[in-house]
UniProtKB/Swiss-Prot annotation:
Superkingdom in the source lineage: Eukaryota
Keyword field contains Cytoplasm: no
Keyword field contains Transcription: no
UniProt keyword list: Chloroplast, Plastid
Localization: Plastid, Chloroplast
Organism this protein belongs to: Pseudotsuga menziesii
Annotated function: Has a function in the early stage of chloroplast development and palisade cell morphogenesis.
Transmembrane segments: none
GO cellular component term, pick one: chloroplast
Protein name: Protein DCL, chloroplastic
């Protein structure tokens, strides 16, 4: 359960970080 939760957070966070880096 924890692993799935972390994977879900990463999937939501990585695109956000990439978006911020573009700016």
């Amino acid at each position: 359960a924890w692993v799935d939760w972390e994977d879900q957070i990463l999937q939501d966070t990585v695109p956000l970080v990439n978006f911020v880096r573009m700016i």
